[in-house]
Amino acid sequence: MQIFVKTLTGKTITLEVESSDTIDNVKSKIQDKEGIPPDQQRLIFAGKQLEDGRTLSDYNIQKESTLHLVLRLRGGMQIFVKTLTGKTITLEVESSDTIDNVKSKIQDKEGIPPDQQRLIFAGKQLEDGRTLSDYNIQKESTLHLVLRLRGGMQIFVKTLTGKTITLEVESSDTIDNVKSKIQDKEGIPPDQQRLIFAGKQLEDGRTLSDYNIQKESTLHLVLRLRGGMQIFVKTLTGKTITLEVESSDTIDNVKSKIQDKEGIPPDQQRLIFAGKQLEDGRTLSDYNIQKESTLHLVLRLRGGMQIFVKTLTGKTITLEVESSDTIDNVKSKIQDKEGIPPDQQRLIFAGKQLEDGRTLSDYNIQKESTLHLVLRLRGGI
C-alpha cells in the first residue's frame, strides 16, 4: 500500500509499504529516499510518536495514511513560535542559535523579514545578538511572534474579562478602523463595542492621534450588550468595578461576575444598594437597579460570630452573623432557618425592640449574645 510522510518543511514523501512493516523499516525507506539517518527521524501519527519495533498495523496505519516526520537534531531541539493570529510554527533549533538565526528560520518558513519580527518569551522581548540559552529557552518552549509594521505601532485592548488583545495600527486610524480590527480578531460587532482611553469614551470618526494614543497605549473595551446594561460596584478600598449585567440577573449571578473579576468568593461578598443588603435569590430588577447604578461591596470577613435567638416556645436558634449585619439581615437569616416572614418578627435585646435599619454593633450585640424573638401576629398591633 502507499502511505505519505510529511516533513516540517511541508514536503510530502510517498512510500510503498506493507502493514507488517516495522517503523524501523519505514525509517530505512525514508533514508533511501531522502538520505536522513533513521536515528535522526521521529515519526508521528495521530499525535503519537511511533516506536521502532512496532508495525504499521499495530498503529492502525492504513493505505494513504499520512505520517509526520520530525527531525531529531544532534544536540538540537524543537521550539514553537505562536503568531498573533494563533498559528503555531515549529522550528528545529540549537541552544546556541542566536535570536537572529531564529528570525531567519521564521523568514524561511513564513516569509516575514527579520526586521519586522519581534520575539517574546516569558514576557521579555528577545534581543538579536543573544542566544536561546541566554534566555533559558529549552526544548518545546513557546515564543510569541509580534509583527513590527513599518510606520505602524502596536496598541493593546483590554476586555472586561481581563483578556488583552494586541493590535497593529497607525496613528491615523479612526476609532471605527480599530473596532473593525477588534471584530476581525474577536468577532465582536463594532456596534457592540465601546472603547475607553484615559477615562474617555472614544468617538467613531476621530483618530488615535486625536486622542494622543501612542504606541503600546492600552484601551479598554466595554461591551454594549443588547438588552444588557452596565453597573458599577464600589469596594471599601474605593476601587470601582464595571460589570455587564441584565435586569433579570440574580444577586447570585452578580456575585459570580465579581468573583470572575476579583477572585472574591460569593460567600464573602455583601452587596448594598440604597442602604439595603441585597439577597442572593432576588434579581436586579426586584431592587430597581438600573443601568449605571452603583452597588457597594462589603467583605464578609471570616471571623464572624454566633448569636442565639430564643423563641417564646423556648426553642433556641443559632445564627452566624457579622457585627455589621443589620437587624433586617438577621430577620432574613431567621426566615431562612424557620420560615417566619421578617414582618412578623420582633427582636428584643436587653429589653429593647431592635429597629430594622440598625446594626448589631449599634446595639452592642456581641458573640454569643441571646436575642428574644416575639411574633407579631397578622391582625395584631
From Swiss-Prot:
It is found in: Cytoplasm; Nucleus. Residues 1-76, 77-152, 153-228, 229-304, 305-380 form the Ubiquitin-like domain. InterPro entries: Ubiquitin-like_dom, Ubiquitin-like_domsf, Ubiquitin_CS, Ubiquitin_dom, Ubiquitin_ubiquitin-like. GO terms for cellular component: cytoplasm; nucleus. Transmembrane segments: none annotated. Residues 381 form a propeptide. It holds the Pfam family ubiquitin. Keywords: Cytoplasm, Isopeptide bond, Nucleus, Repeat, Ubl conjugation. Ubiquitin exists either covalently attached to another protein, or free (unanchored). When covalently bound, it is conjugated to target proteins via an isopeptide bond either as a monomer (monoubiquitin), a polymer linked via different Lys residues of the ubiquitin (polyubiquitin chains) or a linear polymer linked via the initiator Met of the ubiquitin (linear polyubiquitin chains). This is Polyubiquitin.
